[in-house]
Amino acid sequence: MPSEVPESLVQALAQILHEHGDKVLDGSRILALLTPCLQVVTRLFEQLFPRGPGTGFQALPAHPADSVPILRAQFMLDMLQKTPSLKLVHPAECPRQFDVNIFPFKSLRSLELRCLPPHCLRGLRSVYSQLEVLTCYRCVSSLEEVIALCGGDLSSALPWLVLHTLDFSYNTLKNLDGSLELLNSLKILDLSHNQITECGSYLKVLSELQYLNLGYNHLTAVPELSVGNTAKLHSLILKHNQLSGTSGLENLPNLQHLDLSYNLLLEHSQLSGLARLHNLKQLFLEGNPLYFQKDYRALTAQHLSHKASDNVLLDGKLLSSSEIMNAQAFGEKVRLQPSSSATESSCTGDLTDSYSAAEKSAPRLPRKKSRVKVRTASISERSDSEYERRGQPIVLQHQREIERTDSFREQYGEDWLQYRPHLEGELDPEYVNRPHSPPPRASPSPTAPSSVPKQKSPVPAPEPSPSPKSGHVAPDDQLMEKAEEGLEEHLWGLQEAKKPNEEEGLIGGALCSPVVVCPVLNGQPRNPDWPWVFLRITLHFLLEMDPERGRILLKRELRSLRGIQTSLAPWKCNGEEQELPLLTLSFDSVCEEKQTVNYIVLDNSPESSVTTLLDLLRPMLERNLREKAESQDELTRMQCLKCKAEFRNEVDGGDIYSPESLQQGKEPTAGLHRNHTGDASCPSCGSLHIILAPLNPTGETSTPLRPLSAEPPQGDDGGGGLAAKSFYLSEDEDSSETDSSPNTAPSEAESTIFYSFDTEGQDQQSAQDTGRSSLTGSYKYTALNQSGALSQDGWQISPGPASTLDFRLVDHRLKLYLDMEVLNGDMEEFRCCMKVPVIRFGKVSEFWAVVAVSNQKIYFLEITGEIRDNPSDWLQPIESQSLTSLARLHVGLQEHSLHLGFGGSGGAYTLLTRNQQHCRVFHKHMLDVLAELPARYLGNIQQSSEEPITPQHRLWPFLQDKVGAPESNAPPRFLYVPLFFLREDIVSPNADSPCANANSQLPLLNTASPAALIQGAAAAAPLSLLVTRTHMYLLEEDHQWLPDTLDTELPDSVQMKEKQPISNISSVHLFQSATLHLRIHLYNETQQNESAWLLWTEDPDRTREIVEWLREPWEAEYHIHFNPVTHNT
C-alpha cells in the first residue's frame, strides 16, 4: 500500500458513518467492510498513533482543531471503537496473504468473516473474550486456527467467556478438535455444509448447547453428546448426511426439532430412537428411502412417543388422528423399556432352546412371554391384604381409581374402555398368581442340510427387590401389565394375519424352486444361530425365506443387480470340509453393506442349483446393464430452463457438484475464492440457466402420446412400456379384447386409459366383419401415464387434467412471457388466466385463446400453434380491455359460458367453457379481481350469476314442446349442455332407403379439449343438447352476445339440427375409461331405421346427468327400468 492514504475512500466511509452511525451503534445495522478498505483505515490510525494503539478506549493525540482530515479521522475512530457488529469480506481478486487488523474495534460483540483466511486476521485476541457471535464463511479448514490460536495472533488457548453462537457453515472442515473445550457458554453451533465424517466425543464438552446444525456433511452416525447438553438441546439438524440409524437420539429427552431428511434410513425399524422424545414437535424424514414406502406416515407414527405424537409436525404437516390410530395396524407398537432396576427375564416355565432366524431378523419386538417382569413371591395372607384394602380411606381408593383411569386413557387413547372390563375381570389374585406357560412354538424343520448346535439363551438371575415392602404387587400394576400383554397379543395377531396376505403375492410369483443357501459375511455365516435359508427368485425380487415358518426375511430388488460371480469356497458341512459353490451378487445400493451379498449353495445338487439361478439372473443383469448404459448416455444431455431446448454438453463449463464428485475425493469448495468463469450456455438462446435434461421414462412407464393426426404405427407391439389395445364394442355390455399385452400393460393405479373413435377405419372394419351389426364401431384405447396426458410439451395451463382448478397458478414460462411481453402498465400485476374457446362478437367461429387477467386489464391471446417452446411462437395478442371499461359480467345458461361486455366500442366476448366448475371458479376469480377496483367503477358493472329464462329467450320455443299444453310464463324444467356431436346411421334391411349420414354436413374442426380429442371428439361438431320432458334437441348456436341487446335475441341465433323423442331411445352406453363420452342408440319404429348419437362433453359429471334426465320420462313411457350399459374398457 502507498504511504499516502486515499482521501476519497476515507471520506466515503466517514459519510456512511455520519448517515447511518446511530443504527450501527444500536446494533440494528451491521457495519460491512471490504478488507482493503479496513486496511486503509487502520494504516491511517497507525500513522496518527506514533506509539501504537493502546488497549482501552483511545483518542487521537493533540492536533490542530481546525484540521478537517484530523477531525474526520477522530470521528471515524470514535465510531469504530463503539461499533458492536462487524462484517469483513475478502474479495476474490485480493491476495491470500493479506494482513487485516481489527484493533480499532474495542466494543465488538459480533464478528463475521467471509472468504478471509484466519491467518490474515490480526487483533482477534483483544476482543475474543467479549465476542458473543462469531461467523466464518468459506475460509476455515480447522476449528483450532480460529478458536485456539485466534487467527494470525497465534495466542495461547484461553476460554471464550461469552460466546454463545458459532457459525462455521460452508467451510472445508473434515473433523472436530479439542478447541471446543474453550467454548463453555456456547448455545448455538452451526457446522453445516462441511465435510465432517465423524464428531467423536468433542461435542460432549458443550454443556450449554441448545441448537446444533450438522446438515450437509458426511456423518454416518448420530453425534455423541454429554448428559449436560442432552438435557438442554432442543434443535438438532442432521439432514443430507449418510445416517443409517437413529441410535443416540433416545438420550435427548427435550429435543423439539429434529431434521433427518435426505439420509439413508431404509426401514421404519431404524427409528426406534425416537420413542423417548416426549417433547418432539417437528420431525423431517423427507428424502429417505423409507419416505417412499406405502403408509409412510402411519408407520412413522408408531415409533413416536405417545405423549408427543398428537402435536408432531411430520415433514411440515401435522399428524392426523387417523394416522395415529391406524399406526397400530402396521406392526407392534414401539414402547419404552421400564427404567426400574428389576431385571427382565422369563420365569414362567421351561425355556426354549433357541429361536429361529425369522424371529431374529424380523423387525418386531419380543413378545410378552420373553419380557415378564420378575416379581418376588407374596407370602402375605389373603385376609391381610383384604384387611389393608378395607382399612384404606374411601378418598384414597377413589384417588387410585382416578389415577388408574387416567393411566388407561393416556396409554390407550380413545379405545381404552374396551380393554378395561376384560382386564379388571382377570385381576383375581388366583388368576394373577397362576403360572403362565409360554405359547406353543412351531416345530423346527425335520430336515436340515447341516447340523448346527443350538445354544441355550442365558437366564439372568432375578435381582432382589429394592424394598422389602414391595413384595405385594399392587392391583394397578397388575392391571397395567395385563393391559400391555393383551394389547401386544392383539397387535401380534393383526401382524401375523396380515403378513401372509402381503407375502403370498411375492412367493406365488417365484420362477424356480427354493434353493438352500447360507448367507456369508466375512467368511462366516451371517446368522450363526440359524445359518441356512431358502433362496427364491421372482420377476422383480430376490427373496431370503425362513425355512421354519416360510416368512420372507430379506427382499432385494433385482433391477438394482449389477454383477454376478461364481467360485468355489471351502465349507465345513456335517463335520467334513468340502468345496461348495459360492454365488456373489453385486447390487447398486447407497448402503455399503447392501452392495454385495454372498451365498454358499447347500442344496443336494449344488451345481445344478447354481446353473438354475444363473439362467434366471443373467438375463436380468444384461437388461439392467443395458438400461444403465442408456441412462448414462442420457446424462450428457442438457436442457435450457428458458427455451427448453436440449443439447449435448460438449464444452467444459467447470466442475459440477454431484455426489459422484464427493466419492472421488473432489473438493466441492475448490474455487471458493475465485469467480466462476464457465461458459456453458444454451446454443439456441444463449441462456446460462441450464440443467441436466430429464431422463426418458423406461421400464414400466408409458411412452408419450403420438399426435392426433398421425397414423398408428403398423406392426408396433407397443414396446417400451406402451400398452396399446384394440377393442371391438358390440351392443353387449362386455367387449372382446383382440390384442393384449399383460406383461407390459401398466396397472390401473399407474395409468389412465384414453379413448378415441376411429372414423377412418370404419368402412374397412364393417367390410371385414360382415356378420356383426353395422351399429358398432371401431375403437382404439391407449394406456398412457398421467404425467404425459396432454400433448403440450409439459405445459400446464388451467384448466387441464393434471392441474388444479386454481386459475391463479400458471406455468412459469407463460408467466415470464406475460410479465415481459404482455403486461406493460405501471404497477400492473398478473392475477389469473384460463385457456378457453373464445367467441368475439362479429366473428363467425370460436377460437382457442388464453384469457389473462391483471389488476388493470383483460388480455385475449389467440393460440395459433402447438403449445411448446417459446410462448411468442404460439400466442398472438389480439386485444386487451381495461377493467374499468367492463360494463357487463354475466354467467351463461346453466353455467356453461361467461359473457364479458365492454363499454363504448370495446365489444363483447363469450368464454365458452362447456364446464360448470370451470366457469364457476373463473367467475369467482374475476369477482376477486374486480373487488380491487375503486367503488365508482364497481357500481357501473352489471352482473348476473345465471341467465334468466323468459318467453323472449332463444330456447323458449323448444321448451313448450308438449302438444296441447297451455302456454305458461313459468320456465319448465330442462337440461342444457354444450357438447360435441357425431351421428352414426345404421342401414336396416327392412328400410326403403338408407338414411343420410350427418357427418358430411358438419364441420370437422372444433375446439374440443385435448382430453375430449383423445377420447374421439376430433371429427365431432360443436352443438348444444337440450333435453326437455319429452324430446331431445341438437341445436346449432353461434353464441353471439351483444351487451346492448341483452333482452333482444339476434335473428337466426339458434338452428335445430335434429329432434328425437325420448321414447325412441333403445340403449345408452357409458365408458369407464372415457368418462367424457356418451353413446345413445335410437330406433324409429315408423321408419324402421337405427341411428346413434355420439356425444362428448367437457365435464365427466355431465354424462351421468344426461342419463339421469333421460331416465324419468323413458321409464314413464315404458314402465320398466332404464338401465344404461357401462363398458369397463
Swiss-Prot record:
Compositional bias per record (Low complexity), positions renumbered to this chain: 448-458
Keyword Cytoplasm among record annotations: yes
UniProt biased composition (Polar residues): 337-355
Record's subcellular location: Cytoplasm
One GO CC term on file: cytoplasm
Composition skew (Basic residues), residue ranges: 365-374
Regions of compositional bias (Basic and acidic residues) in chain numbering: 381-391
Biased composition (Pro residues): 436-447
Residue windows of the LRR repeats: 107-128, 130-150, 162-183, 185-206, 208-229, 232-253, 254-275, 279-300
Keyword tags: Cytoplasm, Leucine-rich repeat, Repeat
Recorded family membership: Belongs to the STK11IP family.
Name under which the protein is recorded: Serine/threonine-protein kinase 11-interacting protein
Organism: Xenopus tropicalis (Western clawed frog)
Phylogenetic placement of the source organism: Eukaryota, Metazoa, Chordata, Craniata, Vertebrata
Gene giving rise to this polypeptide: stk11ip
